[in-house]
Amino acid sequence: MRRVAGTIVLILLMWCFGLALIVQAEHSRQDDWTEYIELICLDSKICPELVEAVIERESGWDPTAVNGDCVGLMQVDQIIHWRRAQELNCLDLMDPYDNIRVGISILEDLAERYEDPAAVLMFYNAGYSDKLGIRAYENGVISSYASVILERAAELERLHGK
């Protein structure tokens, strides 16, 4: 009986240690992506914390996330944005770095059109030609998607001492 209990304890310890290593590896990858975001955003009007908040909302930092035609960390629509990806030489939208680069490029393009971060997020989420979204925004309505991301981005800025 003692031998069985000892084996069970050993298995549980090994499982917990393995789980801890997986969690540590996930944090390491997320740290790498966060550094990459910071680097790209140095030459951009886009706040890195905004990008991080978009990633949290879109994929929960899961680089393998797929929702229809939208893939990766920033859930880039691979049909709509294939030309942009090609122009940026980002050939694999499932690659986290390519996905981040294309996602930030989309945000930059939207920021050129709409200076308000809420509008940028609304159209990132719904698409450039969302007529209902345009009308709603013109009437002062901000989507819950945009509100949640803006709140999280502000929280991340506070955490980063900005």
Each model region followed by its residue ranges:
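Non-catalytic cell-wall polysaccharide-engagement segments
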Residues: 2-36, 42-44, 62, 79-162
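Secreted/periplasmic proteins that engage bacterial cell-wall peptidoglycan
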Residues: 46-71, 77-82
